[in-house]
Amino acid sequence: MRLIVVGGGVAGLAAAHRAVELSRERGRPVDLILLEAADRLGGTIQTERRDGFLVECGPDSFLSEKPWALALCRRLGVEDRLVRTDDRFRRTFVVSRGRLHPLPDGFQLLAPTRFWPLVTSTLFSWPGKLRMAMDLLLPRRRDVGDESLGAFVRRRLGSEALERVAQPLVAGIYTADPDFLSLAATMPRFLEMERTDRSVILALWRQSRTIAASAGGGHVNDGTGARWSLFVTFTEGMEEFVRVLADRLPPGSVGLKTQVTEVRRDGAGLWQVMTADGALLQADGVILATEAHQAARLLGRLDSDLPRLLTEIPYASSATVTLAYRREAIAHPLDGFGFVVPHVERRPIIACTFSSVKYPGRAPERHVLLRVFMGGALNEAVLEGDDEALAATAHRQLVELLGVHAAPLFTRVARYPRAMPQYHVGHLARVSAIEGRLGNHPGLFLAGGAYRGVGIADCVRSGEAAAANLFESFAHRLNS
């Protein structure tokens, strides 16, 4: 069986690696080709070393509570290369009226779970705190249809909870506008909490007590006895993950700087993949591990409905600005993992990670590495500036918010145009329609962050599922 994977990001690498595993497990030889338009693998993952600093241009970690990336690391034999967060500083700040306020202890993304930290918090007004408490009394929603995250938080917890916490935290994950973001597609557990417990605060409180009793310390048990922090990364940065996956693929199976221009089927039912240099490759199956809008472009002549559905998934652009400083140049104690910036603050940045505090080995002694996030669905206009302008803007914001009083030792700007899928209300229905259309094209599969999860672990799951489904499809065709 010949398999072509288009796209060398995490989803494509996971798909290719899983195909190699399944080939070995089932004794079915596979001729694997992975095509990537760029001159490197990894997609948005890119790690750089500079002057003793370890710079993550893209994702700096993955969630351990989603098991797929950890499970893959275990199969790869690199679990001992994983690094936990430094939990001495496990807290987040929120910018309010130009100052950094700690997120109250026990606040779980959308709602509080502890009474006293909320009461004493300087982040919320008293009317805002009382409005959040009304969640304990409000009835559950009767309409079971999809709802935006913004509408859900306003309804259950009030506008202040949305503007001060939910919106900036969600922006840090999805770079999205919460008034368009589908709750069912992004945070379905909160929908389930309302259905089963009525009150989100009560449901979170019960869950936190259960977790504290069974695990403790804010760590995740992966089922093998190991306990991980919520976020984990690699000793040498996330690109180590990419290198390990690439090294496990068959020699000569990866084609870099190879742009695919079209995917179609021939009269015999084989798949044809055309490249910009005029090559035509044939395969029994194809996995498109690209952005949805790229997949739509490649399939334009195959199926009129499928590209239309794929282009209905919007994307947002973003950028990261990494800045290195001497420790004495920053007045703030940096006693947390970073801060988020609510949109109501009207600032040109959406968040900042204290990279060298969050993980060890990211900066030389007596130095600090900070990473500022810009753009997203609510503030894409800021990205119109050049790299120098973005770096200067990020530095000015750190001067105001952290008391920085010296120029950075260096800056590194990384841009990600149309790279973050936006899970708007109705997203799951769109994905189901896409999957329905794929059923008309045996041997064609999609993978990546556009469909059922945007994180690294989600992309691993998506790629591995595509490979498994392709093997099942091929076996079914052989037996029919």
What are these regions (language model features)?
Residues 256-370, 375-384, 388, 396, ...:
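Mid-domain catalytic core of redox enzymes
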Residues 1-11:
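Beta1/beta-strand and adjacent pyrophosphate-binding region of the FAD-binding site
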Residues 3-5, 32, 444:
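Conserved hydrophobic helix-helix packing surfaces used for dimerization/oligomerization
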Residues 44, 104-106, 333-336, 350-480:
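Conserved flavin/dinucleotide-binding core of flavoenzymes
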Residues 20-50:
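Glycine-rich FAD pyrophosphate-binding loop
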Residues 88-91, 111, 115, 128-262:
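Active-site/ligand-binding neighborhood in enzyme catalytic cores
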Residues 11, 40, 293:
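Conserved Rossmann-like nucleotide-cofactor binding loop
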Residues 51-140:
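Dinucleotide-binding Rossmann-like beta1-alpha1 core, especially the glycine-rich loop
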